[in-house]
């Protein structure tokens, strides 16, 4: 296995865990981040586990059950340390994208943009 293949496998592992963690709750979701992690959104950059936890807690608290029923991944790919996700939860979110930079088994940087309905 080459170093690039190992990195791609590690990225895929973190990415898949991140997606499945939403169903398990905030503590499971936070396992993908550390104190050096940052989530960049159009509104603000959320730095470190405390701010990232607050960001996700607000997201989870604001999502009604119908949101999760409508949630659908429309595109998913990994390339080395980068993972990309496009998703929808119509009519709540017609399109959203996430890009993750994975380093040392954690999401080091994530971008998130949800396009309004």
For the regions a protein language model found, what residue spans apply to each?
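Short, low-complexity N-terminal intrinsically disordered segments enriched in polar/charged residues
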Residues: 1-31
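Hydrophobic residues embedded in beta-strands of well-ordered beta-sheets
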Residues: 37, 81-83, 107
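Short beta-strand segments enriched in hydrophobic/aromatic residues
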Residues: 33-34, 89, 114
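Short beta-strand edge/turn micro-motifs at domain boundaries
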Residues: 95-117
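Short beta-strand segments that buttress and anchor functional surface loops
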Residues: 82-90
């Amino acid at each position: 296995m080459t170093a690039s293949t190992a990195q791609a496998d590690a990225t895929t592992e973190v990415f898949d865990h991140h997606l499945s963690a939403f169903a398990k709750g905030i503590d499971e979701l936070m396992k993908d981040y550390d104190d050096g992690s940052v989530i960049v959104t159009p509104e603000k950059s959320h730095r470190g586990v405390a701010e990232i936890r607050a960001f996700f807690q607000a997201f989870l608290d604001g999502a009604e059950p119908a949101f999760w029923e409508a949630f659908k991944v429309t595109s998913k790919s990994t390339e080395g340390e980068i993972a990309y996700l496009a998703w929808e939860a119509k009519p709540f979110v017609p399109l959203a994208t996430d890009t993750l930079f994975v380093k040392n088994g954690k999401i080091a940087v994530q971008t998130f943009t949800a396009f309004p309905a």
